[in-house]
């Protein structure tokens, strides 16, 4: 299982999810919502292949990627023919959602129910890198909100798993709690 928990990354992914949910309700903003969900998904997946590298245990803890795990995942995908032709002879793409998916140990993927979303992760594996600028030649002409829903489900599962691991991070502990009601001012 994962040696180091990275709750700040989970919180960051959640923030991108919240932005995506707001954006998908805006006029002509679905593409931007999808990109925000892709960034959130990238951060969430990277949270499982990262380890703290500074300010351990503090609110502003920093992390570094395990490039070894990403390379192993990339090599596996190349072996099974799931690396796009234009990337075959290039180093691993640390933004590729499918590579990040396979960098996560399988028992964790199963526990957080990530495995059931592999199809959507593969479909949207390059949304962030290939869809940021819709005016570019080759940019997708259609968008959807599926990744928003997948990220929403996964954050719930990841937070539950972090709680099982005994994580005491404030975001993890308070996640899902209703906001406190303010009492009316007494005049």
Question: Where would I find each of the regions flagged by the language model?
Answer:
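Long, charged low-complexity segments
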Residues: 1-8, 18, 53-187
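Non-catalytic amphipathic alpha-helical adaptor/oligomerization segments
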Residues: 9, 35, 43, 57-58
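A long, hydrophobic alpha-helical segment
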Residues: 13-31
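Short, hydrophobic, well-ordered secondary-structure elements
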Residues: 20, 30-52
